[in-house]
């Protein structure tokens, strides 16, 4: 029967089912494949069961109940038919809940959930809250994005997170794990943030993983194991059967926000942040024959950073049904009061970026011939005195995802939010990231009181010698852009001196802050604090050529990281300003970069380095003069011994080591004193990057399928949140939420847009079809769950309105790709710094003028 059939046909199908003439399951597939149902959808009920944004919804197996998790850290089981709450569970989570699932075959009594601080809770509805709070897994570093259960398996579940690992837990072995630096349950180490997972319904041993390098990797779980089971592979390529990347995203870091298998397992739906939705066949292999871009082509693409704009923190004006593109607002004269100021500051940053980019280009040409000994005065004079950020490799995943700094935040007194990180073993360590309430309203009704932690670092003696004019350093801004988490991007603000900025710039502007939410990680704490007896030094067996190849390989294979780097500072104050609950942390005056990343603009890295910027290449390239990397020149006595043992443990962890390093975000790693830990982290990061590069090279020799895009679905906008779902509905439809507050439904086979539903005042994140009936549940920034069913008497699809929304979304998607969210305090600090710079320049001009007059008088 055709999809465009009429109701009499459907009634006849019902009649045949009642007579036993047809399989009952076929009726569902037929009515779910009809446009009549899709285009008659209407809001049937609203479930107001939460006090925060609803980030996850899930039907039970019978379709009778809905499990939901929210920013209020509560789990709620509700009945959408009676509109009543069955159970409200105080989950024990201390950060926003991002994913929650019923364990299969447990009569809806057992639940697994994860949150922004990385903690996973295993909850039994029939047990008391205190018992459930003991059943937690704190294994992940950073945000845990998704929980996935295995069909018909009540004992095991999987999780993925910012640390780049996919972990497999078995509740028969343990129902909790608070072990420090736990690696027992790692199933796959992707070496890139793993943001989404999906299991093939008919063949559950096929596991799809979406990573922050734009790739979707499909694994055969039968070939994988964990350390707990005794057969951990330790390689990211083991068990991989397919790897999918849209061709235009090959050189970009575009995060996967949603993965979904079709019911028959023949196709996979992938939704990308700041991009579109793609359908591909995992068994396809036609992309293998396509030419991959050369390293030079990849570097050339990385050299064209986009010009960024600024958006005030808490400004959700670009979301919701009434959002308009900037060009349309200007035309209609609807500019908000702060637009002109934001535009001016955006223009200012753009000028800085352009200047710095020109400097980077010139440095790239000079870097090959310049001796390592130092930087000429003429080179210094060409560098900008304002923040230098030529490596503005903020990729097209300019989501609003904040950099965590939970160690700077005091616990909130509100039950709906807690910024104090959960710690189970050490007061200086805590699971990373506490993405807080992500709604605009919550920013006004909740706030986090930030405590000031002041850390002062002394300048290196070499730095003082290299400084052209002591006492003339100008304070400039140091920015750190990060995209970890699920809601919004932010900039971390730092102050440094002019020479620090110049030294950083003279190195080819190669000091990069980690992007992807600092997903390119640091070393485990166990590697940082080895036994004191371990004092034997083992230098890495890497030559300068190897390091150079590593730098170029990283430039080519780790494309367009989502960050802004301006400089690192030898003198800074780690003092957070304020933190609103709306979008994770606010502005943090902290170390601007924990791990320098070599990019295309730092080709040979032959420029001088400051003590604070002792990067990976310096630790390995200087073998000819000093076989051991130099970290803190002032480290003496016991601290020096600790430094040596710490360095040793990092150096010993090469790519041949059994201790496979995972991505550890910078906020988790900053617990150590001084720069010693940071330097060790950079060495560890070097080995991890090299290991990743080797695995990527192995992909060419392995029999791994590379599917081509089968269909692309456009019209929606997915840029402001990292938990936006795309889903199949029946055999003939595909749907997704959007930043415009609408639900989009397309024809699966033709990508024709069939339905548009206004479903949220800001952003629709979650869409879950009923397992049997033509009912849809949705949620987003609003504090409720909406139930949709085909109640309209006639089709209500407005094609003209849909075309208008699609056009606006396309324009605003381009705008959002080039937009960075900054807190209001950032503007104030920036203006104050600029004022200081101007004052110092005027004073310098006066002193220069008086000096010239004195010289003229002497000559006379």
From Swiss-Prot:
Positions of the IQ domain: 676-705
Subunit structure: Interacts with the nuclear receptors NR3C1 and AR in the presence of ligand. Interacts with DDB1, CUL4A and CUL4B.
Tissue distribution of the protein: Highly expressed in skeletal muscle and testis. Expressed to a lesser degree in heart, prostate, and adrenal gland.
A GO term from the CC aspect: Cul4-RING E3 ubiquitin ligase complex
Polar residues: bias regions: 379-388, 409-421, 480-490, 627-636
Residues that bear Phosphothreonine: 654
GO molecular function terms noted in the UniProt entry: transcription coactivator activity
Biochemical pathway: Protein modification; protein ubiquitination
Described purpose of this protein according to its UniProt entry: Ligand-dependent coactivator of nuclear receptors. Enhance transcriptional activity of the nuclear receptors NR3C1 and AR. May function as a substrate receptor for CUL4-DDB1 E3 ubiquitin-protein ligase complex.
Name recorded for this polypeptide: DDB1- and CUL4-associated factor 6
Gene name of this polypeptide: DCAF6
Pfam families: WD40
Bias (Basic and acidic residues): 288-303, 312-334, 457-467, 535-549
WD repeats: 49-88, 92-133, 139-179, 189-229, 251-290, 718-756, 759-798
Coiled-coil regions, chain positions: none
Residue numbers of Phosphoserine PTMs: 336, 649, 657, 847, 850
């Amino acid at each position: 029967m055709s999809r465009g059939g009429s109701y009499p046909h459907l009634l006849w199908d019902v009649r045949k089912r009642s007579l036993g003439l047809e399989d009952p399951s076929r009726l569902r597939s037929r009515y779910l494949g009809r446009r009549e149902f899709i285009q008659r959808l209407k809001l049937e009920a609203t479930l107001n069961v939460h006090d925060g944004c609803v980030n996850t919804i899930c039907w039970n197996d019978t379709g009778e109940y809905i499990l939901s998790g929210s920013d209020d850290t509560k789990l709620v089981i509700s009945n959408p038919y009676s509109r009543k709450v069955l159970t409200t569970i105080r989950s024990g989570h201390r950060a926003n809940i991002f994913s929650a699932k019923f364990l299969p075959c447990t009569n809806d009594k057992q639940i697994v959930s994860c949150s922004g601080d990385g903690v996973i809770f295993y909850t039994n509805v029939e047990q008391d809250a205190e018992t459930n709070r003991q059943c937690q897994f704190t294994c992940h570093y950073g945000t845990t994005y998704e929980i996935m259960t295995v069909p018909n398996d009540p004992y095991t579940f999987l999780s993925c997170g910012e640390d780049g690992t996919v972990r497999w837990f078995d509740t028969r072995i343990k129902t909790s794990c608070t072990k420090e630096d736990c690696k027992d349950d790692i199933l796959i180490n992707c070496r890139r943030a793993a943001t989404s997972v999906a299991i093939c319904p008919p063949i559950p041993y096929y596991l799809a993983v979406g990573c922050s390098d734009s790739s979707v990797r499909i694994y055969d779980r039968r070939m994988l194991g964990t350390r707990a089971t005794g057969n951990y592979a330790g390689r990211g390529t083991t068990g991989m059967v397919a790897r999918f990347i849209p061709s235009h995203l090959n050189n970009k870091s575009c995060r996967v926000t949603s993965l979904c298998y079709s019911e028959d397992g023949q196709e996979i739906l992938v939704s990308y942040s700041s991009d579109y939705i793609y359908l591909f066949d995992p068994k396809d292999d036609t992309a293998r024959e396509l030419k991959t871009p050369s390293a030079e082509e990849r570097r050339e693409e990385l050299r064209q950073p986009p010009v960024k704009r600024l958006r005030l923190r808490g400004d959700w004006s670009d979301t919701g049904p009434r959002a308009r593109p900037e060009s349309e607002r200007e035309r209609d004269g609807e500019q908000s009061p702060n637009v002109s100021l934001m535009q001016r500051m955006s223009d200012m940053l753009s000028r800085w970026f352009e200047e710095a980019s020109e400097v980077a280009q010139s440095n790239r040409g000079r870097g090959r011939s310049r001796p390592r000994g130092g930087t000429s005065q003429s080179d210094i004079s060409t560098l900008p005195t304002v923040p230098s950020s030529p490596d503005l490799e903020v990729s097209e995943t300019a989501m609003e995802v904040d950099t965590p700094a939970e160690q700077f935040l005091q616990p909130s007194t509100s039950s709906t939010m807690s910024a104090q990180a959960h710690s189970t073993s050490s007061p200086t360590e805590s699971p990373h990231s506490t993405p807080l309430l992500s709604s605009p309203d919550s920013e006004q009704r909740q706030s986090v009181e930030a405590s000031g932690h002041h850390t002062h670092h002394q300048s290196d003696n070499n730095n003082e010698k290299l400084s052209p004019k002591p006492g003339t350093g100008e304070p400039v801004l140091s920015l750190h852009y990060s995209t970890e988490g699920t809601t919004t991007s932010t900039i971390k603000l730092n102050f440094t001196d002019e020479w620090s900025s110049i030294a950083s710039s003279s190195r080819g502007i190669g000091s990069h802050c980690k992007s992807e939410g600092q997903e390119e990680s640091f070393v485990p704490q166990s590697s940082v604090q080895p036994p004191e007896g371990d004092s034997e030094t083992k230098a890495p067996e890497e030559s300068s050529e190897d390091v150079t190849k590593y730098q170029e390989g990283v430039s080519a294979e780790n494309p367009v990281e989502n960050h802004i780097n301006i400089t690192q500072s030898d003198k800074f104050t780690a003092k957070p300003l304020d933190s609103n609950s709306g979008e994770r942390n606010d502005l943090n005056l902290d170390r601007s970069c924990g791990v320098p990343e070599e990019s295309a603009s730092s080709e040979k890295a032959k420029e001088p380095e400051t003590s604070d910027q002792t990067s990976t290449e310096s630790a390995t390239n200087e073998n000819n003069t000093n076989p051991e990397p130099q970290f803190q020149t002032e480290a003496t006595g016991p601290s020096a011994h600790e430094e040596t043992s710490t360095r040793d443990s990092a150096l010993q962890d090469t790519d041949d080591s059994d201790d496979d390093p995972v991505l550890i975000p910078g906020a988790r790693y900053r617990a150590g004193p001084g720069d010693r830990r940071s330097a060790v982290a950079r060495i560890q990061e070097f080995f991890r990057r090299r290991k990743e590069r080797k695995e990527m090279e192995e992909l060419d020799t392995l029999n791994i399928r590379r599917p081509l895009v089968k269909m692309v679905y456009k019209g929606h906008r997915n840029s402001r949140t990292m938990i936006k779902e795309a889903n199949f509905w029946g055999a003939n439809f595909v749907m997704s939420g959007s930043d415009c507050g609408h639900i989009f439904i397309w024809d699966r086979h033709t990508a024709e847009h069939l339905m548009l539903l206004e479903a949220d005042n800001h952003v629709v994140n979650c869409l879950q079809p009923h397992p049997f009936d033509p009912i849809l549940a949705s949620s987003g920034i609003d504090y409720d769950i909406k139930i949709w069913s085909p109640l309209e008497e006639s089709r209500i699809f407005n094609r003209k309105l849909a075309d208008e929304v699609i056009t606006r979304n396309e324009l605003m998607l381009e705008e959002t790709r080039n937009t960075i969210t900054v807190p209001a305090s950032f503007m104030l600090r920036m203006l104050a710094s600029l004022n200081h710079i101007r004052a110092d320049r005027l004073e310098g001009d006066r002193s220069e003028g008086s000096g010239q007059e004195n010289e003229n008088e002497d000559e006379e």
